[in-house]
């Protein structure tokens, strides 16, 4: 079968200052809350961090996260424990984004990696919206694997953190039999993801 080339889009990222022990004086920088929302402008590939902090308190990216999924988010959360993460308000870097994600439809890796992110970051307990977001992603991954009763447990947990979390309702649709791939494709068309 002939496959069309993967669609590519350019996404503007913002420069992140993750400096341990001292603030970077730059006009217009704004702190971001990485527990509440996974902010695309706060990306490890654009982080500026002192070498001693990278190899010391923060540490390098964890290569053992299941499937390598969310390893950048895990790193940014670790960095944020040591210093607020600030982003520059204007795009300073172009990053190519391949719409055909390496992680697309790798539900067991999603589930394991995101569960590990929750386990490693007890701070999520103080941020219900953020906890619901990640719990909802886990619920989607479980539902997509066809584990309906377990998905329903995770959907209930997600809604317990925040009834406004859309991934809980998406996981419910998937558990009811709507293919996750179809929902994911529809969201991707709108620039969103599961």
Question: Model regions: which residues?
Answer:
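Conserved nucleotide-sugar donor-binding catalytic segment
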Residues: 12, 16-108
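Membrane-interface aromatic/basic loop that binds lipid-linked glycans or pyrophosphate carriers
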Residues: 123, 143, 147-194
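A short, conserved acidic/glycine-rich loop-to-beta-strand motif
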Residues: 1-14
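Short helix-capping and inter-helix turn/linker motifs at the boundaries of alpha-helical repeat units
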Residues: 66, 129-130
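N-terminal cationic leader/targeting segments used for protein routing and processing
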Residues: 3-4, 52, 189
